[in-house]
């Protein structure tokens, strides 16, 4: 399974049409994901910038380091590949020299909003306009992209399955982290594996970090009382998905069960609105608004969701203030969360496809508290966990 050559050709044509409609003479592409989206060519930039100059009616030119020139020449929709000498370079041979030559004579130049300050300074005389042309193209997925995202979501589900199977009272964080290896092995075995565009993270935020969703657990952390948030977060051959579940390794208290139920209801209110034509801000108001009505507004930290594609976080943004409106074949997450000091965090997340008349959740791991309360002793799992801890020196 892979994106076909013809699709990359069509993507470039759509970008050229967007450049024309924006009344620009040319558009400079610099983001790694954008270049991958347009060409399908995998590379690792390190300190070396890459550029594609797209004009509406003439050839597409790519500027890359000399050592990547032949590799990049395989792009199906690039007419010319130019090269610069490795950094630092002799005068006249560096990337900035090549870039100035590339944009010479252009009066109306568009650039990506993510353009770095270093590159912006080189072309400041052109007064380039930051326009999210590629971000807009990426919002609605093709049939091949949906297939890639569906595949990525299946591996996100597998990661969550591995997390839950490895969990028991007192399990260490390193035992959960180590489950990602099995997922990556499956990706290697079953797909056209792209090592530079594949990454897998399986983790569990222990209750002590439950109110810090972007905190970082120690590999020696142990999961004991309270709600824990399992996260299976990956990119498989260029396309991203996630599955998150709140789970317990002891019987949840009544208060925990009530917060879990309210989190599920907020999700249900979001799901009920997912269909083409619905503003993303309306979905956020339904989910987070419900939690505020329940008196829990002080325990909200983030929007209801975000988009998926090449990135784990991209448009459309399911947030109050978002201008995005759902269309068929968009991908979003649904993840309203509660973060209550002294109690913990409560959040599920799914990777969701917008269909012609509603939605399809591509991640399908069970969501109910009964399936996510893990009280079995799991003697063999504990033994395997002890071997993992010993291998990495965790007591």
What residue ranges belong to the model's regions?
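Active-site neighborhoods and metal-handling regions in enzymes and metal-associated proteins
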Residues: 1-395
